Every structure is written in structure tokens, then in C-alpha cells.
Amino acid sequence: MCADDVPQVFDLERESFNDSSWTIDAFYHEILKNSFAHYFVMEYDQRIIGYIGIWIVIDQAQITTVAIQHDYRGYGLGQLLLKYAMHYTQTKCDTMSLEVRVDNHVAQHVYENLGFQYGGKRKNYYGEGEDAMVMWVKLND
């Protein structure tokens, strides 16, 4: 992902996450100033239809955000992005973790199919009393 991608990624972020979306400045900071951050986009017909963000800190990978444009959901593209992130980080990291809304059962199912397991709950993670489930996977067996 490069700085030119940020406006499209930001639009997709708002479409996907509404009130809890990141600001456009947060995305610019991530790709231009955060040395832990690695971001990738998925394109179709010269449009960004998905993206994923990862922080790599020592031997731990953290999925910071992942989204697929609404019209392209249900085709396995989110799983493809996650597999790419897992492959990208497996030589550098032992484990990968993420947070997901406790009521987002579709995403939880995708993560479980990739080997992620329940790791705990973060109370009020998304604000407004909305909790997050922490999930993690071991990258190297």
C-alpha cells in the first residue's frame, strides 16, 4: 500500500466500519511513519476492493484492520488476504492475533477456518459497550 491508495482505503474503511472507522490521518501515519506497520491492498479493475494491515513487533504479528468491499464479500477474498498476511509474517513471527466484534460470527468463522482460536475478550474495545473477541493463531508448528 502506498500513500496514493489511502483515499480509496479510507472510503472502504468507512463503508465497512461506520462510526468505528479509522481517520484518513491514521492511515497516512501508519504507512508513512509507523515502522511496525505493513499494509497491503487487493485490486480489481484498478480499484481497491480490499486491504489488510499488520503490525510486526518482535515475534508477534497483529492484524490491525482488514476489509473487503461489500460487493466482493462471500467469495473468499478476505480469507485470501489473511492467508497472504500469514504467509508474509510466518518467517518473522511465531504468532498472529486480531480483535473481532463478538457479534461478527461470519468473520469469526473465517478466522477459525484459518486456525485462529479464542484468546480472550476486550471489554468496550469498540466503544458504546461493544466488546471484542481476541483470536490468535500459531504461525509455525
PLM region descriptions:
Residues T89-E99, R122:
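Conserved GNAT acetyl-CoA-binding A-motif
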Residues D25, R73, Y125-G129:
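Conserved acyl-donor/pantetheine-binding loop and adjacent beta-alpha core of acyl/acetyltransferases
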Residues Y39, R101-H105, L114, N124-D141:
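C-terminal "cap" of GNAT-fold acetyltransferases
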Residues Y118-G120:
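A secondary-structure capping/hinge motif
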Residues R47, T65, Q69-K83, T95, ...:
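Conserved glycine-rich acetyl-CoA-binding loop
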